[in-house]
């Protein structure tokens, strides 16, 4: 359970970074 939660958070964090990068370039 803890491992699955960790993976989910990392995926969400990576998506967040990607979105922030796109918005930052605009």
Swiss-Prot record:
Pfam families: Nuclease_act. The keyword Methyltransferase does not apply. The keyword Transmembrane does not apply. It comes from the Viruses. GO terms for biological process: regulation of viral process; symbiont-mediated evasion of host restriction-modification system; symbiont-mediated suppression of host innate immune response. GO terms for molecular function: nuclease activity. Keywords: Host-virus interaction, Inhibition of host innate immune response by virus, Restriction-modification system evasion by virus, Viral immunoevasion. Plays a role in the inactivation of several host DNA restriction systems including EcoprrI or EcoR124I. As a consequence, it activates the host anticodon nuclease PrrC. However, the phage-encoded RNA repair enzymes normally offset the damage. The conserved N-proximal 18 residue region of Stp is critical both for its anti-DNA restriction and ACNase activating functions. This is T4 Suppressor of prr.
């Amino acid at each position: 359970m803890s491992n699955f939660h960790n993976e989910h958070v990392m995926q969400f964090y990576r998506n967040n970074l990607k979105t922030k990068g796109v918005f930052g370039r605009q």
